[in-house]
């Protein structure tokens, strides 16, 4: 499972290099979460998750506040949450989550990104069965044993705990996201190195260099699309 954490790290690193894009995507996601429920994260669990994730990407406070105020103001801009599934080079599997205010624009753009980069879109369910929805929480300066002790004291069950880069990485069911964070916060943890609700591949594949290069171009093309929020895959990209 350690490889899966590396894919999240690589994804964070690539997005950190495109701060304006990641901020825009978070702004949209925060707006949608606040508009669909209460604009208060304490009474809106979906919004609370997005805000916790935003912290790990250092999203500026003004962007967060602007998105919430936009939702409070009754803005009429509506977004649909869409999921596309497809295949990359050598049968690699990809899931694309989007937020769009124009479905007729998004689907052709995603299909074109696949088609121009050695991939093809599949039907709903064609690859999702090979992924597990997972909460991933990273805590710096804790060993796996220390993290386990904290979680056991809080009576929180998780799937797995790994150690990497001086951090304990906790994998849990999505509905345990807040419980895991609260357990650590009550133990004095103030910041998290990662706080994600993600789709983790049940097994990963390694691509030859030429296919890997094409695969990375495909992922870049998908992530560059304005409506795309998240891209998940089952390829081991290495260090």
Swiss-Prot record:
Keywords: Cytoplasm, DNA-binding, Transcription, Transcription regulation. GO terms for molecular function: DNA binding. The keyword tRNA-binding does not apply. InterPro entries: Integrase-like_N, TACO1_YebC-like_2nd/3rd_dom, TACO1_YebC_N, Transcrip_reg_TACO1-like, Transcrip_reg_TACO1-like_dom3, Transcrip_reg_TACO1_YeeN, YebC-like. One of its GO terms (biological process) is regulation of DNA-templated transcription. One of its GO terms (cellular component) is cytosol. It is found in: Cytoplasm. Its main location: cytoplasm. The keyword Transcription applies. SUPFAM superfamilies: YebC-like. Belongs to the TACO1 family. YeeN subfamily. This is Probable transcriptional regulatory protein YeeI.
């Amino acid at each position: 499972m350690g490889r899966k954490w590396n894919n999240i790290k690589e994804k964070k690193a690539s997005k950190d290099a495109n701060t304006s894009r990641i901020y825009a995507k978070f702004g949209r996601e925060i707006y949608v979460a606040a508009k669909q429920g209460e604009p208060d994260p304490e009474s809106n669990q979906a919004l609370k998750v997005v805000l916790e994730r935003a912290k790990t990407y250092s999203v500026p406070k003004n962007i967060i506040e602007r998105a919430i105020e936009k939702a409070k103001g009754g803005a009429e801009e509506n977004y649909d949450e869409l999921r596309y599934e497809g295949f990359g080079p050598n049968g690699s599997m990809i899931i694309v989550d989007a937020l769009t205010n124009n479905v007729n624009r998004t689907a052709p753009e995603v299909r074109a990104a696949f088609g121009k980069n050695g991939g093809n879109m599949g039907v709903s369910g064609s690859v999702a069965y090979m992924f597990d929805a997972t909460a991933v929480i990273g805590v710096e300066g804790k060993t796996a044993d220390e993290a386990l002790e904290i979680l056991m004291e809080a009576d929180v069950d998780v799937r797995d705990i790994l150690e990497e880069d001086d951090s304990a990485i906790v994998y849990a069911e999505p509905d345990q996201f807040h419980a895991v964070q609260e357990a650590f916060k009550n133990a004095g943890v103030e910041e998290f190195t990662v706080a994600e609700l993600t789709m983790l591949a049940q097994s990963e594949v390694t691509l030859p260099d030429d296919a890997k290069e094409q695969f990375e171009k495909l992922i870049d093309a998908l992530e560059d699309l304005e409506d795309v929020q998240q891209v998940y895959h089952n390829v081991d990209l290495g260090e």
